[in-house]
Amino acid sequence: MTASHSETPSTKPDASTFISDHLQVDRSKLSQMYLHYVETKDKYPHAVLLYRVGDFFECYFQDAVKLAQELELVLTSKQAGEQGRVAMSGVPHHAWERYATLLVEKGYAVVICDQVEDASEAAGRLVRREVTRILTPGTLLEEGMLKSSRNNYLAAVVIAANHWGLAYADISTGEFLTTQGSDLEHLTQELMRLQPSEVLVPTNAPDLGSLLRPGETSPHLPECLPPSFCYSLRSQVPFSQGEARPRLLQKFKVRSLEGLGCDRFPLAVRAAGGLLEYLEDTQKENPVPLQRLRTYTVTDYLIVDSQTRRNLEITQTVRDGTFHGSLLWSLDRTSTAMGGRALRRWLLQPLLDIKGIRARQDTIQELMENTPLRQDLRQLLRQIYDLERLTGRAGSGTANARDLVALADSLSRLPELSHLVTESHSPFLKALQKVPSVLEELAQKLHAHLVESPPILIKEGGLIRPSVNPLLDERKATVEADQQWIANLEVDERAKTGISTLKVGFNKTFGYYISISRTKADQVPANYIRKQTLTNEERYITPDLKEREARILSARDDLNQLEYEIFTALREEVAQEAEVIRNLSRAVAAADVLCGLAELAVHQGYCRPEMLSGREINIVDGRHPVVEQSLPAGFFVPNSTQLGQESLVSSHLSLADNQEQITNTSLREAAPTTTLSTSDQGQMTNDNPDLIILTGPNASGKSCYLRQVGLIQLMAQIGSFVPARLAKLGICDRIFTRVGAVDDLATGQSTFMVEMNETANILNHATSRSLVLLDEIGRGTATFDGLSIAWAVAEYIAVDIRARTIFATHYHELNELASIVPNVANYQVTVKELPDQIIFLHQVQPGGADKSYGIEAGRLAGLPAVVIQRAKQVMGQIEKHSKIAMGLQNLD
């Protein structure tokens, strides 16, 4: 059967003339093909069904309408038997991946129902079709459907009261991990870190199998799950302990889950088992070769919540969501796709383990000091393709011949890598020193069997080199002889007819034919049989040509089938070595990341931070890693930071414990009634604070300084060198930021309410080992309200939490806090004030500022001169008469 795409479609068909819902049809009146379509659609009611008909994949009924609307295609109709016409839309079969990708990106699941036999084999019956692929956002494998620089995670969650289990996998790379926790906020943050393309949720919802697109809601979706992901509602049965545990044992061929590290995490086991069942359901005959399940604990890593990732612009910018201008952009010097993904994972999951951090630092230092090794490694790494995903496609049976050639090219580079790092002492480089001989042999075999530049399609021949298989060579000789017979026929027929433009052609519909221009039709011999008339030519056949055609096509089919069998055998050999290849590919990825970080450190002048077990943050001449690269060399003004000295904390605790001077309670009671002159405030600067009150003009660089400290700490905990002259850094358990705020219209929250929610999260979760970066707390409400909240927040962090904190503010009254809380210090971003302007020096120095120069910032921004002049007049009046200028003196 072939698609009737020759029908003239209407771009705006009258919906009343065809049926657009498969549930409304009388199935007894449908033709065989449409009945099969409807029965298949019944099994996948929530997916878009692409149904192969000849050279097209077609959609009918409601899926046709959906396809046409979402991809802006023509919606037409086709006759479906006695039932009448039904809605139809379609795409060419050779381009199905592109259209399916667009649908998946929009949050749809796509079912591929393909023809599994040639139409010629059907012999008058319905061509056999089967579901061969189910594509969902989290189960993509094809290269064109994936972003090389990031993982494509499928996640599964199980929630029981406040406890939760999470499993996630990237089937394109084989990664498979699981974890469990007792704080739902940690689950939310893990999902935000992973950014899974799809999340499986067990439920008793009536619409099981449905896929909720981002932003769609369901009463069956737990409230703690962020609305920004695709959610698949699944049956609870595969997520039960009784089904999940045996499935994991069978998958990994183990007798106990103890070896996988998840035997004590029942919710994690349930999530992992449910995820495996989903892969079995969607991947059909293409089992996914997952790596061995790994179990981890969220609190084993530095926690960076979604707000902090956004504010620090770790993977994308706040302004326009682009990669360029992010921390990842500034650090990424990787040479492979695997390395790029690994660097992204490292940034989103920094280490707490000092030993692990130092091991990475040692490797970077070795590569910095050995320039020839670093340069040779980078040059060789550029020649290695994406081993992880190439292996994944081979293991799932979707790799083509070009994939295997790329894999062979990459594997053949590994012995060279091994030779380069022979003398290295780094555990990361030592992992490359021994390449299993089986991989070298596999690369040689692939190169020996596959042609250098094979076609994309794997069932149409042209894949295998000569002399690989005697039977293949014999069949190739037969086909070549047939091709020569065709060439000779063309020459002979030209001579017989005297028609010099005569050609012998071929297409899949008519087979071989003789083409003659219509102007020469009167010269056609009597034994020619007209087969087709076109605008400028006539096409003919002869009995001899048709007789030979059957032999030619049969021989070519036999040849193509044998090539396909040889190719699939090679692909299966690759799949058998998937675990070995992936183990080595992880080593390549880590080496690539560290090599890139070494290159970055050399060219940007980074230093090796000394990692400490205490709370100290001591940065000398630190620089913002992104802003620095965006400015001409030497333009960035470095600044130092000192926080969290243990000696001061011990002294402070001693004072509080002995109640000799100031207790925590007395601090809060004394604060409102204690006042200093502005000049005194500027002098109250402790040398080793836990909390810095940072004041200074608008646009002077306070926010940049805050982010700079956070980014340096984060970089250090992934093992990177940092942009500073010197750095001594204690390990942080969490980095919190509250920088800027906007209205959350979706939840009806004002800017101030968003700010308070973020601040509450920090106060409720920060510890003495956290780093807190606050910018402008309390500015979204009345002045005294905001000042009061800002004071109370700063005081609580300094006294009760003792987190290392930088608190940027325009409330200069907060400088008074340093006079009564010993672990608070005042710092300011300085300016040079001239008679008619100010010059921002961008230098952070001890002392508190007493002006914000907001009017000057307005002038620089282009406010009209008359507005600037009036603002100065109003300010003069306020300073003379308003109680605002009196600070905290009368708050009691």
UniProtKB/Swiss-Prot annotation:
UniProt function note: This protein is involved in the repair of mismatches in DNA. It is possible that it carries out the mismatch recognition step. This protein has a weak ATPase activity.
Recorded superkingdom: Bacteria
Family matches, as Pfam families: MutS_I, MutS_II, MutS_III, MutS_IV, MutS_V
Keyword set, alphabetical order: ATP-binding, DNA damage, DNA repair, DNA-binding, Nucleotide-binding
HAMAP family with a match to the protein in the record: MutS (MF_00096)
Gene behind this protein: mutS
One annotated Gene Ontology cellular component of this protein: cytosol
Gene3D superfamilies, alphabetized: 1.10.1420.10, DNA repair protein MutS, domain I, MutS, connector domain, P-loop containing nucleotide triphosphate hydrolases
Gene Ontology MF: a single term: ATP binding
Keyword Transport among UniProt keywords: no
Record GO biological process: mismatch repair
Name assigned to this protein: DNA mismatch repair protein MutS
Family membership: Belongs to the DNA mismatch repair MutS family.
InterPro entries linked to this entry: DNA_mismatch_repair_MutS, DNA_mismatch_repair_MutS-lik_N, DNA_mismatch_repair_MutS/MSH, DNA_mismatch_repair_MutS_C, DNA_mismatch_repair_MutS_clamp, DNA_mismatch_repair_MutS_core, DNA_mismatch_repair_MutS_N, DNA_mismatch_repair_MutS_sf
Binding site for ATP: 696-703
Matching NCBIfam families: PRK05399.1
Region (Disordered): 663-684
